[in-house]
Swiss-Prot record:
It comes from the Eukaryota. InterPro entries: RNA-dep_RNA_pol_euk-typ. GO terms for biological process: gynoecium development; leaf development; maintenance of shoot apical meristem identity; recognition of pollen; regulatory ncRNA-mediated post-transcriptional gene silencing; RNAi-mediated antiviral immune response; siRNA processing; siRNA-mediated gene silencing by inhibition of translation. Its EC number is 2.7.7.48. The gene is SHL2. Disruption phenotype: Lack of the shoot apical meristem (SAM) in the embryo, but formation of radicle and scutellum. In weak alleles, formation of an incomplete SAM and abnormal leaves production. Belongs to the RdRP family. It holds the Pfam family RDR6_2nd. It comes from Oryza sativa subsp. japonica. This is Probable RNA-dependent RNA polymerase SHL2. The keyword Transferase applies.
Length: 1218
């Protein structure tokens, strides 16, 4: 019987233990691997021996091959027959010692084999056997026993594209026989597995070794977009969202498998590789045609039912039950020809410049069109219009969700749409923002991503004339998943390491591909791109900047302009260069005599208490606030970049000598002549939320679980009442949403009702949905008496050790009306000085000592520092350093003064020692080669996420929580991993700390999960139940349903209707483009920034994508707010009251063209790119929400001041002044 080669398979079990008990310590395995026997031992003989000595054997596989050291598989090369491999092999090809993978019927067999081998009592033909136990697998075995895969042997596979609905162009075919398909509900994956001879190349040798290998193509069922059935042909067409994962492992195996059922896969690792087809078909083609024997239709129908349950679209294209829609199958013209590019890319097209070529490639890479549709007619259409029109049309095209078969017809529609909406043309981006192109590179392919507007940086601002030559490249796994080190490292079975005295870690062909791209660069769209640099955040995301040189600007010239980097530690050198790529706002250009670059640091006990913080005078701080348009509420501190300095500058009075900026030596990172003060972030109201790490630590420090439960229940109750209770909705918006909820909060204050106002209702639902999702995935529980605050220093030295100062903003919307005239110009800050015991923490926080308990005191001299956590400069050690080893260069701290969250005893645990290891210095200057090696070293070793996840698991399994020895060890490893970008010291997690199973709240596959009985598990399941079947469906409002509020009509508005309609058409077109580009489901999610689901397109971190989306929408809203506020030159001198009336007329006009039935009917003529009716877009009307609030309140009459609720206070404030 042939063994299943595809991995996770079924296995019966004698008993099923309780999974929770198993997770807590009763983990077992039925697998072992053995070595030490002679090369002539057959699998059957070994199985017989083990059954006699140990116990019943269900499978035994003897293996005598492996991936030779220093070799790489090359699937494009021809091979000799496998029997000739030894003769053809280079001299360095040594065979691996024979070893075997054995499955016993019961766990006792595996344990007995390990015990006998450990006592040297398991002896075969005079040789003592060595035994290595496989990973604990009781949960997987238990789950596997009841879930069998749907297995289809000897299928035929073709990979290709659909140039039209009834035609399939094949780019590659699998072997004629021996290819198996499995659809496995066990782990939700589909696998295609076959065996082939494979050439392995060796550095310095022309000869190759031919080794027989199993090859596996694997993809999750969730990546199947559609299945088309052709019953008469006995075939399926699978359209995939992403390329499959490609694996191989050597297959010179001898099997003994007497049982008739499937088993779990052996502990013989599969090795990831790149595209195995010469033509790059796996990377560039997304359609898989699978043909099989007609006798398998009943089983196939059951497999398709399972896929249907997983929300895969199944389309029956005819057969015995209906008219046949046949499929024409033929080979593509270049069938089998080697692909010239490292990833498929259109390098040149007559008459097309780079911006257009890039967008055409983006369409092909996304699968909207395929390369066969790039016809002369298609390019001719692009040649007839201006470049900016074509780019806008292709961007509109890129927003499509489904493949397009008539590419020319769709392009014509897009060009017409742009012609009707000139605002879709790419407008000039402001100095603080830049359009950045991205390229995502996976093991088999690449994706060009359209330019996105994001915050600019020092380098892009200086080189703005060649800004389109910068490219952000991100290395990811297929399906936009994180590229973890399992993809880059070639692993062998643990028994092989035991048997080999000179074993060393190998790299995969994926690593080889990444290294080649970094060192040699690549060609794309007619340009040669070379590696430039990366920031610290990019390093963690496996991302870097590349640049396409021209005759004037080179990579070396850019590096020289950036500054003088003298550090001989590679990690620090790379981090300093990356500092220039921090996203910043350029503000004031300083004169050298205004800057003190040697302001003394505060140092005690060898600790720098002022590490990363300086001072800014009030007048300069106000100048910066003006540049950032923050004068309504000027910040107390800014996180900055200036020349070669980085850190925070807090507002303090100057010394009267003309110096306005005070920078400390601890802030200096490199030498630079750049004199623009650049701002990264600033202090502001940021609501406080718990997360899993903080909850684990507080729970371990004896904060009762009932506290977290009650806080979540309160939050859940508020979210459930958000539509029915105005007071609750207002509280949620103003206290937990920062600025994101301002529009909705103003609407509530003015008297608009969620029941009758669809845009308000949609925004509230979006916020509810996003906060529920955060509760489920992150345990992100709102803390009313909490904030995230920027760390600062008490420059006066009045705070004592153990003390801090906090003056926190209390949310208020009054400042929204400061532009409405002198009656609204009160800028008194609504703040609260916190007194008493507080808890602080900084992420990541894993050690019990990372939670610091301090005493907040009132110091009048510090009252100017708002939304800051002010630390003392006294004591044995900085409190910032005690909290996760942080400093004052911009770190944000979670702070709560809720007594229920303060651990009993009110004393901190001893903090961990965060002293960094000694930095390794090179004996020479750091080279570009060193920096690339460092980037690669991080890619194959970066495991902060794994360490943090392992900490969560062990804290959940242990009765001691975060106090468990394993957790303390993991906390130490995490500190090393966090500092890797600065020190270059790796954090290596030992095997015994790697989790075998995960608590259910971590959302792993069922076979890897157990039911957690600790607080995080209970919180998780509570939210699961609350949101089960919960339709957060953002009910899309159609034009037929749209209510019209006659209260918002004012005399004189008709004069502005025509211009309002033009603005609305332009706004809606740009809004629709944003929704399409980011695949955001609803307008309400976009405008509130509370987005429940985002398709990954360049980063594992959804937060990063959300930030870019917020930036893009903020720029759009700002543009139209500016349009609204622009008035004729002859009206500039009118008084506040007249100006406000004028704005109320315009606001009424903007409302009417959005909601009035006449204009709604007119909007019906505007269709989407595929002719579909676009849902009513309502956010345009509420850009001037402050003026619509005035109109509404005037209709209501004056609001009573006495006894008012929070939601009514703003209404009273406004009505008193109008």
């Amino acid at each position: 019987m042939r063994s299943p080669r595809g991995g996770a398979a079924a296995q019966p079990s004698g008993r099923r233990g309780d999974t929770t008990a198993a997770a807590a310590g009763d983990l077992v395995t039925t697998q072992v691997s053995l070595g030490g026997f002679d090369a002539g031992v057959a699998a059957g003989d070994l199985a017989d021996f083990l059954e006699h000595e140990v116990g019943l054997v269900w499978r035994c596989r003897v293996k005598t091959s492996w991936t030779p050291p220093d070799s790489y598989p090359d699937f494009a090369l021809p091979t000799a027959p496998a029997s000739a491999s030894a003769a053809a092999a280079p001299p360095r090809y040594d065979r691996v010692p024979p070893h075997a993978f054995v499955h016993f019927a019961r766990p006792e067999g595996a344990r007995r084999a390990a015990d006998l081998a450990g006592e040297t009592r398991l002896i075969l033909r005079g040789k003592p056997l060595r035994v290595a136990s496989a990973p604990d697998s009781s949960l997987r075995v238990s789950r596997r026993s009841s879930i069998a895969p749907f297995r289809f042997p000897d299928v035929r596979l073709e990979v290709g594209a659909l140039p039209s609905p009834g035609a399939f162009l094949a780019a590659w075919r699998g072997p004629d026989a021996g290819l198996d398909l499995s659809v496995d509900p066990f782990d939700g994956c589909c696998r295609l597995v076959f065996t082939r001879d494979t050439a392995f190349t060796f550095p310095g040798f022309r000869e190759v070794a031919a080794i027989r290998c199993d090859v596996k193509l694997e993809f999750p069922v969730r990546d199947v977009l559609e299945v088309r059935l052709y019953r008469l042909d006995c075939s399926l067409l699978l359209r995939l969202a992403a390329a499959p994962l490609v694996h191989y492992r050597t297959a010179d195996d001898d099997f003994h498998e007497p049982v008739p059922f499937d088993l779990l896969d052996d502990d013989d690792p599969w090795i990831r590789t790149t595209d195995i087809t010469p033509s790059g078909a796996i990377g560039r083609c997304g359609v898989y045609r699978i043909s099989f024997s007609a006798r398998f239709w009943p089983k196939m129908d059951r497999a398709l039912d399972y896929m249907r349950e997983r929300r895969v679209a199944i389309v029956d294209c005819g057969g015995g039950w209906g008219p046949r829609r046949g499929l024409t199958v033929r080979d593509e013209l270049e069938f089998g020809e080697p692909m010239q590019d490292v990833f498929f890319c259109l390098q040149h097209a007559e008459g097309l410049k780079f911006p257009l070529l890039f967008m055409v490639n983006a369409l092909v890479h996304k699968g909207i069109i395929n390369q066969h549709q790039l016809t002369p007619e298609f390019f001719s259409l692009l040649g007839r219009s201006e470049e900016n029109v074509n780019v806008a049309a292709l961007r509109d095209f890129w927003g499509d969700k489904f493949p397009v078969f008539d590419a020319c017809g769709r392009l014509k529609k897009a060009l017409n749409r742009v012609a009707r909406n000139p605002k879709l043309l790419c407008s000039k981006v402001g100095d603080d923002h830049a359009e950045v192109r991205r390229l995502v590179i996976t093991p088999t392919r690449a994706y060009c991503l359209p330019p996105e507007v994001e915050r600019s940086n020092r380098v892009l601002r200086h080189y703005h004339e060649v800004a389109d030559r910068f490219l952000r490249v991100t290395f990811m796994d297929e399906g936009m998943q994180v590229l973890n080190n399992n993809v880059l490292n070639s692993f062998t079975a643990p028994i092989v390491k035991d048997l080999m005295s000179n074993f060393f870690q190998q790299k995969t062909t994926v690593y080889k591909r990444v290294r080649m791209l970094l060192t040699e660069g690549f060609h794309m769209c007619g340009r040669k791109y070379s590696f430039l640099a990366f920031s610290s955040n990019q390093l963690r995301d496996k991302s870097a900047w590349f640049f396409a040189e021209d005759r004037k600007t080179t990579v070396e010239a850019i590096r020289k302009w950036m500054g003088r980097f003298t550090s001989k530690n590679v990690a620090k050198h790379a981090a300093r260069m990356g500092q220039c790529f921090s996203s910043t706002y350029a503000t004031v250009t300083m004169r050298p005599d205004e800057v003190d670059e040697s302001f003394d640091d505060v140092v005690h006990n060898e600790y720098i208490f002022s590490d990363g913080i300086g001072k800014i005078t009030p007048d300069l701080a106000l100048e910066v606030a003006e540049r950032l348009q923050l004068t309504d509420n000027p910040p107390s501190a800014y996180q900055i970049r200036f020349a070669g300095f980085k850190g925070v500058i807090a507002v303090w009075q100057g010394h009267g000598d003309g110096t306005r900026l005070f920078l400390r030596p601890s802030m200096r990172k490199f030498e630079s002549n750049h004199l623009v003060l650049e701002v990264v972030s600033w202090t502001k109201f940021q609501p406080g939320f718990l997360n899993r790490q903080i909850i684990i630590l507080l729970s371990s420090l004896n904060v009762p679980d009932s506290i977290f439960w009650q806080m979540q229940e309160t939050m859940l109750s508020n979210l459930n009442n958000i539509l029915s209770d105005r007071d609750v909705a207002f509280e949620v918006l103003t206290t937990s949403c920062a600025d994101d909820g301002n529009t909705a909060a103003l609407m509530l204050s003015a008297g608009f009702e969620p029941r009758t106002e669809p845009h308000l209702k949609a925004m509230l639902l979006a916020i509810r949905s996003a906060q529920l999702q955060d509760l489920l995935e992150k345990a992100r529980i709102f803390v009313p008496k909490g904030r995230w605050l920027m760390g600062c220093l008490d420059e006066l030295g009045v705070l004592e050790q153990g003390q801090c100062f906090i003056r926190a903003t209390v949310p208020s919307l009054n400042s929204y009306f400061v532009k409405h005239g002198s009656r609204f110009s009160s800028t008194d800050k609504n703040t609260e000085v916190i007194l008493g015991t507080v808890v602080i923490a900084k992420n990541p926080c894993l050690h019990p000592g990372d939670v610091r308990i301090l005493e907040a005191v009132d110091v009048p001299e510090l009252h100017h520092l708002v939304d800051c956590l002010v630390f003392p400069q006294k004591g044995e050690r900085p409190h910032a350093n005690e909290a996760s080893g942080s400093d004052l260069d911009g770190d944000l701290y979670f702070v709560t003064w809720d007594e229920k969250l303060i651990p009993p005893g009110k004393k901190s645990w001893n903090p961990m020692d965060y002293s960094p290891p000694e930095a390794k210095q090179l004996p020479r200057q750091v080279s570009q080669h060193d920096i690339i090696d460092f980037f690669l070293k991080n890619m194959i070793s970066e495991n902060l996420g794994r360490i943090c996840n392992a900490h969560v698991v062990h804290a959940d399994l242990s009765e001691y929580g975060a106090m468990d020895e394993k957790c303390i060890h993991l906390a130490e490893l995490a500190a090393t991993a966090v500092d890797f970008p600065k020190t270059g010291k790796l954090a290596i997690m030992p095997p015994h700390l790697k989790p075998k199973v995960y608590p259910d709240f971590m959302g792993k596959e069922d076979g890897q999960s157990y039911k957690s009985e600790k607080i995080l598990g209970r919180l998780y399941r509570s939210i699961q139940e609350a949101s089960n079947g919960d339709v957060v469906s953002q009910e899309v409002c159609t034009p037929n349903d749209l209510p019209y509020d006659i209260d918002l009509e004012v005399p004189g508005a008709s004069d502005f209707l025509a211009s309002a309609w033009q603005c609305k058409c332009s706004y809606d077109a740009q809004l629709s483009a944003l929704l399409s580009q980011y695949r955001v489901r609803t307008e309400a999610e976009l405008v509130t920034g509370h987005i429940t689901f985002l398709v990954k397109n360049s980063s594992k971190k959804q937060g990063d994508i959300k930030d870019r989306l917020k930036t893009a929408y903020s720029a759009l809203r700002k543009e139209f707010k500016s349009t609204f506020e622009s008035i004729a030159s002859d009206q500039c001198e009118i008084g506040d009251d007249e100006k406000n009336l004028l704005y109320e007329m315009k606001a009424s006009a903007w409302y009417q063209v959005t909601y009035h039935p006449k204009w709604v009917e007119k909007s019906r003529g505007i269709l989407g790119p595929d002719g579909e009716e676009i849902p009513a877009s309502l956010s345009f009307a509420w850009i001037p929400v402050d003026y619509l609030a005035r109109i509404k309140l005037r209709c209501h009459g004056k609001v009573r001041v006495e006894g008012q609720k929070p939601v009514e206070r703003l209404a009273a404030y406004i009505s008193e002044r109008i």
